[in-house]
Amino acid sequence: MGQKVHPRGFRLGVSADWQTRWFNEKNYATWLKEDEEIRKVVKNAYSQAGISEVFIERPDNESVTITIKTARPGVIIGKKGAEIGKLREDLEKELNRRVIVNVEEIKTPETDAQLVAENIAGRIEKRASYKRAMKRALSDALRKGATGVKVMVSGRLAGAEIARREWYLRGRLPLQTVRAVVDYGTATAKTKYGTIGIKVWIYKGDAEV
């Protein structure tokens, strides 16, 4: 039986980049745990900011550089930089290191797989039709320039007694092509019938190798 590989891990170093950029044998476990904590703090503090990814770099033992990719940079930066300043201070106190926080705006959130998955999850939690939410995400992504989109939901859809899986695909999605830039995102919708998993693949063309 064929096994599925993670679309991002399959393309690392070719058409995808690492979210964590450092190497240290001595402090590996400690730093890895810190990275998870940093991502959790950032996403919990700015859950309404449309955060897609958090990149972490450690150029040396005394500093951490955090780059946040978001659809709403103003929410994170705050008035006159107040919010981002508070975030930096809180992280420096927690990590006991110098922290640099950068914010990158996502120009087209409709073609960001993680944001699309979270948007569908939000609609399902508000009791919108999962089919309508999926079809709207597909049309929005294609309208904004995506070459191909696949959306899959699984769970007790519409409160059904038996869990099932449904998916829609529009355009091309070459999952076995390493140079293909395929963005991948997941989210979970919590409903009164249980959780519904959402997976999104967005093909944006080929990278120059």
Curated annotation (Swiss-Prot):
Keywords: Ribonucleoprotein, Ribosomal protein, RNA-binding, rRNA-binding
Family: Belongs to the universal ribosomal protein uS3 family.
Keyword RNA-binding: yes
Quaternary organization: Part of the 30S ribosomal subunit. Forms a tight complex with proteins S10 and S14.
Protein's UniProt name: Small ribosomal subunit protein uS3
GO molecular function, one term: rRNA binding
Organism annotation: Pseudothermotoga lettingae (strain ATCC BAA-301 / DSM 14385 / NBRC 107922 / TMO) (Thermotoga lettingae)
Gene: rpsC
KH type-2 domain sequence ranges: 38-107
GO biological process, one term: translation
Gene Ontology annotations for the cellular component aspect, listed alphabetically: cytosolic small ribosomal subunit
Database matches in SMART domains: KH
